[in-house]
Design a protein with these regions (language model features):
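Flexible "cap/lid" loop of the alpha/beta hydrolase fold
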Residues: 1-19
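Conserved alpha/beta-hydrolase catalytic His-Asp/Glu region
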Residues: 3, 22-85
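Short beta-strand segments
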Residues: 34, 66, 93-94, 121
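Residue-level signal for the nucleotide or nucleotide-sugar donor/cofactor binding architecture
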Residues: 60, 101, 105, 132
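Acidic catalytic loop of the alpha/beta-hydrolase fold
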Residues: 71-73, 96-101, 127
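Short alpha-helix in the alpha/beta-hydrolase fold that links the catalytic acid
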Residues: 79-80, 88, 103-112
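Short beta-strand/loop motif that positions the catalytic acidic residue
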Residues: 86, 92-94, 98
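Catalytic active-site module of serine/aspartate enzymes centered on a nucleophile-bearing elbow/loop
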Residues: 115-154
Length: 154
């Protein structure tokens, strides 16, 4: 995990960091972090305000998120052997240029493990393909519904 997650998840020092530093520093650097998530594209207009990013900098919320980040790799490794048991149709959308999560390690591996999965790669998108290419997300929802025999009227 990245340094801030390890620090925030630390028992005593993490509480201090989350209570004193994050509420003040987080909002100052979050816009740049959001922009990084959308690269090579740009964040939609008003994304910061409309997505309520500021709520993530509440001490308890930030610490819980950091603990999740620290546990993620181990949790995914524990779940992965069960992926072939998931028989429901799935469409996995990943971004070609995601700098946050490795498309190869996450989306491609999951698609390969699920028996009824389809992988959709959003070209020239960063970590937020559902924001930049909502057409892909909507098409995926429609395809999964069709695969599952659910009508558009349901």
């Amino acid at each position: 995990p990245i340094w801030w997650a390890r620090l925030a998840a630390t028992p005593l020092l993490g509480h201090i960091f989350c209570a004193l530093i994050i509420p003040n520093l987080g909002p100052l650097i979050s816009r740049a972090n959001i922009d990084q998530n959308f690269l090579p594209g740009a964040a939609p207009d008003h994304y910061y305000e409309q997505s309520a990013v500021g709520l993530a900098f509440r001490p308890g919320a930030f610490r819980a998120s950091a603990q999740d980040v620290c546990a993620l790799s181990a949790e995914l490794a524990a779940q992965a052997p069960n992926y072939p048991e998931i028989l429901a149709p799935a469409i996995i959308i990943t971004a070609e240029k995601d700098r946050v999560l490795s498309p190869k390690r996450h989306a491609r591996a999951l698609a390969a493990a699920l028996p009824a999965a389809e992988l959709v790669i959003a070209p020239d998108c960063g970590h937020m393909p559902h924001q930049l290419r909502p057409d892909l997300a909507l098409a995926a929802i429609r395809r999964v519904n069709a695969m599952a025999g659910v009508s558009a009227q349901s």
